[in-house]
């Protein structure tokens, strides 16, 4: 966006601003506040698509735990169903756990269904140490997924 190259693809200022908003918010911790429902919907769509793509790209590199485990703070956040500060990742297992925590930031049930159908979540779970505390987080996550998959997305009415 800084170079303005994307303007070569849009003549309509409103569409350009919509795409700019969605792309600029695709990897932020939270979507920038807006009263524009269309902007918000597109930002959510791009964020979900980005997560699905990252799960796909990283799947071939997923391997068993390297024995370093997950940082206790990350496990606590996972058990609570919350997000974490990515800058505090210390281990390979932290990286895996972050990808599980992303599920709580997937906006559309359709997106989550794609993630579930590709087995991304279970593959990550199977490559983490599953102690008692981790199992609490996994149970919470699976329950959340089941609930989320029952919701209707905005285009479903």
List each language-model region with its residue ranges.
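Alpha-helix N-cap/helix-initiation sites
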Residues: 12-13, 93
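Alpha-helical scaffolds flanking conserved acidic
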Residues: 13-22, 38-45
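His-Asp-centered metal-binding catalytic motifs of divalent-metal-dependent phosphohydrolases/nucleases
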Residues: 1, 17-29
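Ligand-binding beta-strand-loop-alpha-helix segment within the catalytic cores
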Residues: 9
